[in-house]
A protein has these predicted regions:
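Extracytoplasmic metal-acquisition and chelation regions
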Residues: 1-143
Length: 143
C-alpha cells in the first residue's frame, strides 16, 4: 500500500481501524496512526482491531526469519482470511468490537453476524461439494 495524505484525515475521524495484522501493514500503518493523533486507534485502544486475533494461520515460523530468506512472514501467512472458518472468526471480532463502540446497535451487529455466518457456512458446504472430486490433488498458486 502506498499511503496517501488523505489517509491521515480518514484516520483522524475514524472510530475504528481494522488491521489485517500479522505485520502486513508494519511498513506504513503505524506511522500513519501515530501522525493521525487519534488516540482511539493506537494499539490497545478500543478503536484498533487486529483482525487476525483468534484465526488459524499457516506457515508460522518457529525459527528466526530475515529478509535474506525472501518474502517470508515471521507471524505466518497474512492471507489467513481466505478460509471460511477464519472468516467467521474475523466477522465475530468485528461484530464484537462494533458492539463495544456502538452499544445502541449491538443487536443489529449480532443479527448481521448471524446472517453472515449462516450464509458463509452454506457457501462453504457448496464449495466443499464442488472440490471434493479433487481431494488430494496438489495445487500451485502464485501472486
Amino acid at each position: 500500500v502506498n499511503p496517501k495524505p488523505s489517509y491521515l484525515l480518514k484516520l483522524r475521524k475514524a472510530d475504528l481501524l481494522i488491521a489485517v495484522g500479522r505485520e502486513l501493514e508494519v511498513g506504513w500503518l503505524p506511522a500513519l496512526v501515530q501522525q493521525s493523533r487519534n488516540k482511539k486507534l493506537r494499539g490497545g485502544g478500543n478503536g484498533y482491531l487486529d483482525a487476525s486475533i483468534g484465526c488459524s494461520v499457516l506457515q508460522q515460523s518457529t525459527k528466526r526469519v530475515d529478509r535474506s530468506m525472501g518474502d517470508v512472514h515471521p507471524f505466518g501467512n497474512p492471507h489467513y482470511w481466505l478460509t471460511p472458518n477464519n472468516g467467521i472468526v474475523i466477522a465475530t471480532n468485528i461484530s464484537t468490537r462494533l458492539s463495544e463502540i456502538d452499544p445502541d446497535q449491538a443487536d443489529h451487529y449480532r443479527t448481521r453476524l448471524a446472517d453472515f455466518v449462516r450464509r458463509l457456512k452454506e457457501a462453504s458446504a457448496r464449495w466443499d461439494a464442488l472440490i471434493s472430486p479433487y481431494s488430494g490433488t496438489s495445487v500451485v498458486t502464485y501472486h
